[in-house]
Amino acid sequence: WGMKLFLGEYGHSLDDRARVTLPRKIRQEIDERELILAKGFDPCIFGFDRGSWEKEAAKHLDTPVTDTKGRSLRRYLFSSAEKVEIDKLGRILVPAQLKEYASIVRDVTVIGAGDHFEIWDRETWNTYAKDLEVS
């Protein structure tokens, strides 16, 4: 496979320092130690490796500054974005404002979403996933 794809669904928990261990299969798709986390469009956190983030950023930066909706999307995505490092044990620190945005307390579900991964509060994800199955 030439293309990187983030796949799967994994249950994890935050530790007392708000770190989560990234699933091995997610880490295998990442070539570097630095990631970008940002607010998702649903109540979740988007996670990107450098290449995926650069592609996502380019899409938004190509939108003319005169495009009101494009400007709003750009502000939404970039203002919440933070660089985080993967430590030697495969953990990342979940920034407080992103944790709060996604209503994450302890138990999370990490899902692959193709070109990025997402971190959800486990109960929120379970409810959302049930709705996906019904529709």
What are these regions (language model features)?
Residues 1-12, 16-19, 25-84, 88-89, ...:
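Flexible "stalk/tail and boundary" regions
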